[in-house]
C-alpha cells in the first residue's frame, strides 16, 4: 500500500512526517534540517529555489524572493515574476514539492497521498486554496486538518483512556489559534476554536524592523524602508534578534555597510533589551487574549477544568507568550512536545488513520466560523453555527421577497456579523425558472453540507417544481480545475528543469574533479609514464578542458569518460611498473641481508680470537 505523509505547511517553516512501523517520524530535508523555510525564490537563470537555499540568497535577490505567502492564500494576491503572475497556491506548491522530493528521497518510493494542515480559523476559501496548492504539487490531498487538532492528536494518542481536557495555544509565523479539545479512549473531539489569521511571529519581527528603521533614520536621516536589499537584511536580523531574546536579556544587531551616505558607507549597530522588545510588542500579546477568552466561552468549559496546555508554533518560545499562557490558564504548558514538529506528526497520524494503519482513533473537528446566506435587508441568516462538529449537513426553507419572482439569488457568507456584507463572501449562485407566484409562496430549501476538510457545498431546491441548483463554494481566489492542472504541469516541468540543472552541475563537478586529479597525477608521476601514455592523457585532458569551457553537457560526459579511461590505463601501467621495481628491490635487499650479517659475525669472532691470542 502506498505511503501517505503528513505536512505542516507553515507561514515561516514547513515540516513533513511519515509513519514508520506505526510511529511518526519527522523527515529531514536534503540539507539535513527537520524543518524547511517556507521561502521560494526565482533565480535570474530561471531556476526555482526553495527553502534554505532561497533564504540564503534573499538579500541579493529581494524582488524575486517570496516568503510568508500563507498569509495571502485564499485571496486574489499574486506576484509578477518575468511577466508571469504566480498565485499563492503556486508559490505554496513549490514548498510542498520540495517536501515531497525530500520525503521520496528518504523513503525511496513515490509519494502521492498527503494530509495537509491549516490554521483552525482558516475560512472556506483558504482551505480550498491550500487543497489546490497540494494538487498543483502533485499530491492527492486525503484531508485538510486543523493544526491544533493535529497537535492534540500527536499529544493525546498515547495518553490512555482517561478523559481529559486539552487547550492548544498555536502561535505560528503568521497565524494564531486557540482550540479546546476533549480526549478520551481514542476519541479527540474539538469543543471550540477561535483565532486571528493575521497575527504571528512575523508581526513581532516587524516591530523590531520598524524600531531599527526609525533609529537609523533618526541618526543618519536615511529611510532604510526605501532600500529593498537593506530591508531584507533587517528582516533576517530581526528574526535572529527575536530568537536570541527568548534566551538572552539583550541582543545586539550589527549590520555593517547597511547603506551609503554622502560621506561614505554607513553601519547599523543597535542593542535591544528583552524588556524593550516586550514593550514594543505588548499590544500584539494583548491580541492573543480575545481568541482565548472566546474559545473558552464557546466550549462552555471553565479554565480551571483544563488539564493540559500544549504550545504549538515557534513563536510560543518567546518568554512573554509562555508567561501569558500561564496567566490565562493558571498552569505551566506541557513541555513534552516540539512546537515546530508536533503538527506534522499529528498530520502523519491522521494520514495513518485514513490509510487504516492507525486503529481506534476518531477525530471530531469543528467549523471555525458560522455559515449562512444573505436574506432580505442584508441580514446574515446562519444555517450552521460556528464550532459545529464536521462533517455536517443543515437545511432551512426560505421564500421569495417579491411577487412573481422568476429566480432566487443565493449569496453564501461565512462569519459572525449580523449584517451579511461585513462577513466573508464565499460565493453566489442562482436558482432560476421559478413559476409566477405571490411573494412568500415558493418554498426554497437551502442545504449546507460541510465535509471533513471543512469545505462547503450548497444546494438549493424549489420544493414545488423540483428544480435545484448545486455548487461547491469557491471563493474568488479559488482556481478552476483546468488551471490547477495547468499549474501542476508547469510545476512538474520546472521540477524536471531543476533536476536537469542539478544533474548538469553534478556532471560538471565530477569532470572538474577528474581534471584536477589528472593534472596532479601528471605533475607528480608524469615523468615515470611512457611518452605514448602521457600524450594520450594530455590530449584527453585538453578535450575535457575545452568541453568544460562550453555548455554542451553530453560533450563534457564524453570527454570525462575518455579521460577517465586513459588515466586508468596509465595508472594501471604505473602501478604494475612500480610493483616490478619494488619486487626487484626487495630481492636485492633480501640477498644483501642473507650475506651481510654472516660476514659481520665472522669478523667479530676473528677479532675476538685475535684478542685472546
UniProtKB/Swiss-Prot annotation:
The modification Phosphothreonine is found at residue 175. The keyword Nucleotide-binding applies. Residues 577-598 have a biased composition (Low complexity). Residues 567-576 have a biased composition (Polar residues). Keywords: ATP-binding, Chaperone, Nucleotide-binding, Phosphoprotein, Stress response. Induction: By stress conditions e.g. heat shock. GO terms for molecular function: ATP binding; ATP-dependent protein folding chaperone; unfolded protein binding. InterPro entries: ATPase_NBD (IPR043129), Chaperone_DnaK (IPR012725), Heat_shock_70_CS (IPR018181), HSP70_C_sf (IPR029048), HSP70_peptide-bd_sf (IPR029047), Hsp_70_fam (IPR013126). Residues 487-509, 567-613 are annotated as: Disordered. The keyword Chaperone applies. NCBIfam families: PRK00290.1 (NF001413), prok_dnaK (TIGR02350). PANTHER family: HEAT SHOCK PROTEIN 70KDA (PTHR19375). Acts as a chaperone. HAMAP family: DnaK (MF_00332). Belongs to the heat shock protein 70 family. This is Chaperone protein DnaK. It comes from Salinispora tropica (strain ATCC BAA-916 / DSM 44818 / JCM 13857 / NBRC 105044 / CNB-440). The lineage of its organism: Bacteria, Bacillati, Actinomycetota, Actinomycetes, Micromonosporales. The gene is dnaK.
